[in-house]
């Protein structure tokens, strides 16, 4: 699952090994998923950006984000965004590693 959702995309977009792996020197970006939870999608529920509509407004989906870590720092916990302005970081892409 990690290979499919994290490692392969990081290699495809030239971001591996900074992204896509948990190892010394790599970013510790981790999402803890609760497959038994439920999530209601809506602009006032789960979107942490400036938007006024969603095509999925009101839909309920299986699964729920429990915790999100960005570079080892908790940025989502207990359904609350706890990140800080300026925490984001530009990652320069390299070549797709599958083209070698």
What is each stretch, according to the model?
Residues 2-100:
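Active-site microenvironment of metallo-dependent hydrolases
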